[in-house]
Amino acid sequence: MFMIEVEIFPHRYLKASTTEKFLNKIYDLKTVERVVIHGQPLPKVITYGPARGLPVNHTERKIIHVKGVPVELTVMAGRFWITLSDDSELDKLDEICKEMFPFGYNLRVGKFLKDRPTVTDYIKYGEDGVFLINEMDRRLIGMVDPRSRMANSVTVVEKEEKEE
């Protein structure tokens, strides 16, 4: 199966509202398979130092809604890696970026995400779990943090199949 990966790098960190609008627009595209948001973490609590354990009340750590699915924003969006099933909608993706990021952005096509199980996948899920992921949903490959629960780090937004 031919997949294309696109990196979108806005020239500024995005607020939660802009991230929500952007994600909803790109999920309207038919060829979008997977979106990974990368950026500065927005922790719930301070993890080190004299204030360790105190809550962090960051204004941008919010629950956004992407196609009706609530997604907890745990990073300040600074980069998006988008997997497309083909390159037919690259121009539409570029138009969405021009509309949403008047301050500028970079759009690159390349290889940014894992497509084979990693050692971390085997540690987290075990050999049987990796086999199941390979058979069921390959979008989850390479999407693990060995120290986190999957429910905290990955949200699946299902695409609506439009009947024609």
UniProtKB/Swiss-Prot annotation:
The keyword tRNA processing does not apply. It comes from the Archaea. GO terms for biological process: methanogenesis. The keyword tRNA-binding does not apply. Keywords: Methanogenesis. MCR is composed of three subunits: alpha, beta, and gamma. The function of proteins C and D is not known. This is Methyl-coenzyme M reductase I operon protein D. It comes from Methanocaldococcus jannaschii (strain ATCC 43067 / DSM 2661 / JAL-1 / JCM 10045 / NBRC 100440) (Methanococcus jannaschii). The gene is mcrD.
